[in-house]
């Protein structure tokens, strides 16, 4: 064996030990994410256990994931796991309100059970609210592992640090991006491709509000982009599809993207104007 490989193997082993204290095992974290969803909404459980039994198992699973991340100082993993599960009844009530909002607004939805069992938007919102509680409690990295797991499954990217009010609605959802410092009010509806992003990306802005604020009762239609920490969309506003906003709009606004339509005749040859 070449001497260089020994050093290479040593570095890999060192990194492996370091990563186990910084990053929770993805497969176990992903399984816990789905089990938490099924605990709150047992629509996919073929052999459901009593809630007390599920609670005991899930609480232990969460504690085991937290121990290396928190270095288990003064029983920190136990305290955090207990605090998280104490919040779950309220989280579930909020999520039922989200599901009801989807049912009431989406003409394709036939019942609450359909929304809970099949809608990717509801699944993404559910995992956001779970991850957000862990984030609020100071959990390192695990909330991001949850959110990126859901991102991969649904195409919906919601940072767990974002603040989102009740009765939240995401329809279709693919391509939705909601940044870490975004603030979304109550009864807000978002469609596929919406971005609530930052005007610029710089490490020095880590502690600065970089993402927009969306007021109550707003509707953001497909592929609208709203950027900037100082950008505020006033309550009861409608942002039309493909709109691009970097400045605030007052309450009750309607923002539309007007496409240009040019009618050409067969007599006029189309110019070659390819841009690569």
Q: What is each stretch, according to the model?
A:
Residues 1-148, 269-276:
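Terminal amphipathic alpha-helical/low-complexity segments used for targeting or macromolecular assembly
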Residues 150-263:
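Structural signal for interior beta-strand "rungs" in well-ordered beta-sheet cores
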Residues 247, 257, 267-275:
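C-terminal membrane module of polytopic membrane proteins
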